[in-house]
């Protein structure tokens, strides 16, 4: 596993396909480590919050954006925010609206933490982000399972139609997974099969984080 020399803040990156179990494993580790490090000393940042602002575009133009391409994300701002947190500074995390397809005026203030869990589909494609991580994980869940989970989530939680979900999957989600996301797993310290309920992977990550906290 990678060893970042700055231990004021430990950053764990969790990447993988959309609906591969990233959020589940992130929330599990978060909840199980809170008692160890303190409620206010661990936090989760989602890469989705850093989708670029599209308020200057019409809604018709926004929906045409390829959200599974690295260019849709502001990784520069995300890396700057992580560096600020590592220096002990608070940051204003953007809020992204899945229904409006752009950022809102709201921000989430995150104060410095001992542990930050970072989760998102394209995290491991960017060397700036990889270089800030103390450990990196890739959720290697079969794409057909991810598609079913994504369809259920996007229809129920994001107001999408089933037709639009499957059209997006065919046009951008699967091609971008093959071009960018899947190749990025070569950079992961741990590759996790079977989704976010893999107990052994969770315990290994918790043990590694605990070791880094003692260093």
UniProtKB/Swiss-Prot annotation:
GO terms for molecular function: ATP binding; cytidine kinase activity; uridine kinase activity. ATP binds at residues 16-23. Gene3D superfamilies: P-loop containing nucleotide triphosphate hydrolases. Coiled coil: none annotated. It holds the Pfam family PRK. The keyword Transcription regulation does not apply. Its EC number is 2.7.1.48. CDD domains: UMPK. GO terms for biological process: CTP salvage; UMP salvage. InterPro entries: P-loop_NTPase, PRK/URK, Uridine_kinase, Uridine_kinase-like. Pathway: Pyrimidine metabolism; CTP biosynthesis via salvage pathway; CTP from cytidine: step 1/3; Pyrimidine metabolism; UMP biosynthesis via salvage pathway; UMP from uridine: step 1/1. It is found in: Cytoplasm. Keywords: ATP-binding, Cytoplasm, Kinase, Nucleotide-binding, Transferase. NCBIfam families: PRK05480.1, udk. PANTHER family: URIDINE KINASE. This is Uridine kinase. The lineage of its organism: Bacteria, Pseudomonadati, Pseudomonadota, Gammaproteobacteria, Vibrionales.
